[in-house]
Amino acid sequence: MKVYNTLTNKKEEFLTLVPGEVKMYVCGPTVYNFFHIGNARTFVVFDTIRRYLEYRGYKVKFIQNFTDIDDKMIKRANEEGSTVKELGDRFIKEYYKDADDLNIERATKNPRATEFMEEIIKFVSDLIEKGYAYEIDGDVYFSTKKFNSYGKLSGQNLEELQLGARINVDERKKDPMDFAIWKSQKPGEPAWESPWGMGRPGWHIECSCMAYNLLGETIDIHAGGSDLSFPHHENEIAQSEARTGKQFAKYWLHSAFVNVNNQKMSKSLNNFFTAREILEKYDADVLRMFMLSGHYRTQINFSMELLDSTKAALDRLYNSINNLENLLDEVKNEELRDEELEYKNELQKYKEKYIEKMDDDFNTADAISIIFDLIRDVNTNVTIESSKELVKYTLDLIRELGSPLGILQESTKASLEEEIEKLIEERQKARKEKNWALADKIRDNLKERGIVLEDTPQGIRWKQI
């Protein structure tokens, strides 16, 4: 298996610290709002990578944190007149609801920064003791110049960064790029007692501390959105390696942005969507397949039209699954015949190709294409004449390949029939009202999904093609 390591800017053989085990840390949400589709892509991508590693036999210890104390949390809590803890409690609950709806598996542990205050204070104290940090008026800063390899993850040059950072710089800092690892209390802010007075941790130290305490000095994979590469992950490396003298993470994985209608998603452009808004209109399978239809290191463009296209493609897959489920009830032959054994072995090539693509830096886009190829093959060759054993095998294989992607696990019969009957009713109503455009649109939509309508003396019937 090969993974692209941001630290070295190349694909590397994936070799874990302990054979068969993966220690993985993913930067989670700051819990002051509902997560948006850009966050959703990050969560879906690393959920998929975790699932695939488990599919390949690894035991994965998967940690994803909650940032429940920082400037954004304090600002939002003050705006709505709540405490930071109340705000965090509320949006952690909302995160779990949306993540569950998106079929994201629960982490081994979701630590909250505020649960690790004692350990964070110890971490900061150790950095001061080792000469990597200094205190001024209750604030503690990390000295970037003391850490010789600062910038190695993002490819930034410290001297150039310092030149660019001289505007609005805190004059108390020894160098412009030094960053706060402990912040003294300001009026109205939550604070904890420390050797430097009342205060709270900086954002970067929180992740370093939680990773260290839950996974150890060196971890296999550290991951997050590409926007976190600098300064957040760069600063995590500096703090962690300064404290332990050991490599912090072996492999760094970063997922790319989601653009909306070819523009970067932002509230100011009014093109900002939460995952919850999208999940009200589309199933989790649709959103997951859309998020995984491009390579995780490549930006994807989001639009409702693209989601509709993904839904139509997914419907075709589920139509085929539905046909197989029906065949399972209808076929007469129970056991695999000799001539079917060869075909069953041929189907294994799809699994082999799927693994080959996913083993190459988790290429979900190509893996999805292989599932489509498999289903096209099965649609042609698995029929009412096939044995029950072959039909069941093909169904199990499709679900097996869908499982690491978090898709194609539903039983389709009832839900598909109910949805189609509802659309037929809507079309009948449109025809009675002489709304021919809507009636034609519904018919064309069904046809695109492989459903053909037939007028019979008993009324409208539908069949799959």
Curated annotation (Swiss-Prot):
Cofactor(s) the protein requires to work: Zn(2+)
Alphabetic keyword roster: Aminoacyl-tRNA synthetase, ATP-binding, Cytoplasm, Ligase, Metal-binding, Nucleotide-binding, Protein biosynthesis, Zinc
Gene3D superfamilies, per the entry: Cysteine-tRNA ligase, C-terminal anti-codon recognition domain, HUPs
Top EC class of this enzyme: ligase
Residues annotated to bind Zn(2+): 27, 207, 232, 236
A molecular function (GO) term: ATP binding
The record's free-text note on cofactor binding: Binds 1 zinc ion per subunit.
Keyword Acyltransferase: no
Recorded catalytic activity of this chain's protein: tRNA(Cys) + L-cysteine + ATP = L-cysteinyl-tRNA(Cys) + AMP + diphosphate
UniProt motif ('KMSKS' region) ranges: 264-268
HAMAP family (alphabetical): Cys_tRNA_synth (MF_00041)
Protein family according to the UniProt entry: Belongs to the class-I aminoacyl-tRNA synthetase family.
Subunit structure: Monomer.
Name assigned to this protein: Cysteine--tRNA ligase
Gene source species: Clostridium botulinum (strain Hall / ATCC 3502 / NCTC 13319 / Type A)
Taxon lineage: Bacteria, Bacillati, Bacillota, Clostridia, Eubacteriales
